[in-house]
Amino acid sequence: MYLVSLLSSCCLLVLLGTLPARAAHEDPVEKVIEGFSRGLSNAEREVGKALEGINNGITQAGREVEKIFGELSNMGSQAGKNVEHGLDKVAHDINNGIGHAGKEAEKFAHGVNHAAGQVGKETNKIIHHGVSQGGSEAGKFGQGSHHAFGQGGNVANKLGHETHHAFGQGGNVAHKLGHETHHAFGQGGNVADKLGHGGNVADKLGHGTHHAFGQGGNVADKLGHETHHAFGQGGNVADKLGHGTHHAFGQGGNVADKLGHETHHAFGQGGNVAEKLGHETHHAFGQGGNMADKFGQGAHHAFGQGGNMADKFGQGAHHAFGQGGNMADKFGQGAHHAFGQGGNMADKFGQGAHHAFGQGGNMADKFGQGAHHAFGQGGNMADKFGQGAHHAFGQGRDMAETFDQGAHHAFGQGGREGGRLVQGAGQGLSHAAKEAQQFGHGHGHGYYAAGQTWQEGDKVIHPGVSQAGEEMEQFGQGVRHTIKQAEKEAEKVAHGVQNGVNQAQKEAEKVAHGVQNGVNQAQKEAEKVAHGVQNGVNQAQKEAEKVAHGVQTGVNQAGKETQRVGQGVQTGFNQGQKEAEKVAHGVQTGVNQAGKETQKAGQGVNYAAGQAEKEAEKLGQGVHHAAGQEMNRLQQDVHNGVNQPSKEANQLLNGSHQGQGGYGGQHGGAATTTVVSGASVNKPFINFPALWRSIAATMP
C-alpha cells in the first residue's frame, strides 16, 4: 500500500515535472516572438536595401549634377577664354593701328623736321650769303669811306640799332609765334585731354576734336596773321632798312667803320632770327612737334590727350575711346565695362559672372551656396536633399516608428495575454499546489486519506486541468487573437511598410523626377547661360567691333585731322617760307640796295680818289714839269757853267800851248793845270759858289 502510494506520488511528480517542460518546450508565445523577430529582421533588411538603393540613386544623381556643373564650368571657362582671346585680338589690332599711326606720325614729324631744317639751312645760307656779301661790300666801303667822309651823325649806329630793333621786334614776334602756336596746340591738347576724360566720346570726339582742331584752326589763322604780322613787321624793317640805309649812306658819318660791324650785327641779329626761325618754325608746328624727341614718351600729345595710348596703353590705353573703354587699364578688373553694365564679366567672373546673363544666373557667385536657384524654387534639392530625403522617408520613418510602436503594442497586447496566461497558469498551479499541500498534510490518514487525496487529487487535477485547459484554451484563443491581432498589425505594418516603401519610392520617384526636372531645368538654364554667354560674346564681339570701328573711325578722324593739321602746318610753313622768302628777298633787296649805295659810295670815293689822284698826277706832273724845267735850266746852267770854265780852261790851255811849244806845252798841259796844282792859275777850274748862286737864282 505504501509502495503503491509511493509510486503514485512519483508518477504524479514526474507528470508534474514533464508538463511545464513540455509546455516550455512547445511554448507558442516564443514561436510568435520568433516569427515577429524574423519578420522585423526581414523588414529591416528590405528597408535597408531600399535606403541603400535610394542612397545610391542620390549619389548617382549628385555625380550627374557634378558632371553638369563641371560642364557648365568648362563652358564658362571656354567662353571666358574666347572673350579674352577676342579682346586680345582687339587690343592687338588696336596696338597695331596705334603703332602704324605712330610710325606715320613719326614719319610726318621727321619730314616736318627735315623740311624745317632744310628751310632753316637755306635761310641761313641766304642770309649768311647776303650778309657776307654785304659785309664784304661794307668792309670795302669802310676802308675808303672813313677817309672820304668826315661828317654825318651816328647814322650807322642808329641804323644798326633800328635794324636790330626791327629784327628784334620780328624776333619777338617769331618768339610769340612759337608761344602762340605752342599755346594753340597746347589748347588743342587740353581739349584733347578733356576729350580723353569725357565719356561721351562719340559725341565729343566729333565736336571736341572739331573744337580742338578748330582752336588749332584759329591758331593756324593766328599763325597766318601773326606770321604775316611778324614778317610784315620784318617787311617794315626791310623797308626801313632800305630807307635807313639810303639815309645812312645819304648822311654819311662814321658809316664805314660802324657799318661793317653794325650792319653785320644787324644782319647777324637777323641771322639769329633766322636761326630762331629754324628752331621756332619747328616749335611753331606745335608742342606736338617734339614728336621725334618725345615720341617714345608722349608721341600722341599732338593728337590730343586721348593719344597717350603708347605711354599708357598698359594702364589706360582706352581713355581715348571713352569712360567705358578703360579696357586696358581695368582689363583684369572691369574689362567689360565697354560692353555694358551687365558685362562686368572679367572682374566679377569668379564672383558674379552671370550678372550679364540675368538675375537668375548668379550661379558663379552663389554656386556653392545656392546653385540650384537657377533650377527653380523646387530645386533646393542639394541643400534640402538630406532634409527633404529624410522628410520623404520621414513618413516612412513615422510608419516605421508606428510599426515599432504598433509591433510593441501588438507584442504588448500579446505580452498582456501571455501575462494573463502565466497568471492563469500560476493560479491553476497555485490551486493545485494548495491541493498538493493539503494532500501532503493528509497523507498519513491511510487509504481514506489516499482515496480522499486521490479524489481530491482528481478534484484538484480535473478542475485544475480543466481550469488549465480553459486557461490554455483562453490562452490559445488569446494567442490566436494575439497572433491574428499581430498578423493584422503585421499586415498593417507590412502594409504600412509597403505604403512607406511605396511612398518612399514615390518620393524617390518624385526626387528623381525633381532631380530630372532640376537637371533638365539646369540643362535649360545651362543652355540659356550658354545662349546668354553666346549672346554676351556676340554682344562683346559687336561691341568690340564697334570699339574697333570707333577706334578705326577715331584713328581715321585723327588721321584726317592730322592731315588737316599737316596741311595747315604745311600751309603755315609755306606761308612762313613765303614770308621768309619775302624777308630774305627784302634783306637781299636791302643788301643789294646797300651794296648799290656802297658801290655808289665806293664809286664816289673812287671818283674822288681818282679826281684827287688826277689832281695829284696833275700836281706831280706840274711839279715834275717845274722840276723838269728847273732841272733842265739847272742842267743847262750847270752845263753852261761847266762849259764856260771848260771853255776858259780850253782857252787857257790853248794859250799855254801856244806860248810854250809842243814839248813844253805838252809838259805844262800835263803838269801845270790849276786843278792839279792850283799854283799857276789865278781862277779855279769850277767856281762852286757861283754855281749854287746860279741854281738858286733859277729856282722860283
UniProtKB/Swiss-Prot annotation:
Entry's localization field: Secreted
Entry comment describing in which tissues the protein is expressed: Detected in epidermis, in suprabasal keratinocytes. Detected in suprabasal layers of embryonic epidermis and in stratified layers of embryonic tongue and palate. Detected in adult stomach.
This protein's GO CC annotations: cytoplasm; extracellular region
Keywords: Coiled coil, Secreted, Signal
Skewed-composition ranges (Polar residues): 641-654
Keyword Signal part of the UniProt annotation: yes
Region: Disordered, residue numbers: 133-158, 183-258, 283-391, 641-669
Induction record: Up-regulated in differentiating keratinocytes.
Key word Secreted present: yes
Segments forming a coiled coil: 488-546
InterPro entries xrefs: SBSN_GxHH_rpt, Suprabasin
Composition bias, Gly residues: 658-668
Signal peptide: 1-23
Subcellular location, principal: secreted
Full protein name: Suprabasin
Organism field: Mus musculus (Mouse)
